[in-house]
Amino acid sequence: MERRLVPRSAELMSQQDTVLLVIDIQEKLIGKIENAKRLVWNVRRLLDGAGELGLKILATEQYPKGLGPMLSELAEGIPQIPSKMMFSCRGCPETIEQIAGCGAHKVLLCGIETHVCVQQTAFDLMASGYRVYLAADAVGSRFRMDHELALQRMESSGVTVTTTEAALFEWCEVAGTPEFKRISRIVREPSPTSFADD
């Protein structure tokens, strides 16, 4: 008799239903962000994992004339990075249209600053009916209190707060596959020793 698996929880992200949205990680702002090196490392891992698994990857820039472009080490492979003046990514209609167009109903956010562009985007996406996830180790603010209170506010309002590693394994779902081997390599990547300098 064949055993049937129970259905997968709707709480979990998958390769098929999730978009990765990278918010405003720009040259002239990142150096002011607490734990910036760790944040960039985790965003790089999310980008690598999403690329390996075929997730849709989107990114934005906030006022690049003043804040500079997206970090080049993260921008590689992202074909279009629209700019905005509005803090929320709803200020980039093309980005919202791409999320809607790919059929995803979950969005994982990473980027800066937690309490401004990330938080406002999270609430606007929720208001539009999306399930919003946040990689807490891949977002940041200049000041710790702003970051921590924004995480609390978003979580209490229904945003699912997670981590980079948890997200990668959720997307992967099962072990013993070629995809799992690629994700495992990303997860096992040693963290830079320079984190102590943050």
Please provide the spans of the model-predicted regions:
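Short acidic, Gly/Ser-rich segments with clustered Asp/Glu that frequently serve as metal-coordination loops
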Residues: E27-K32
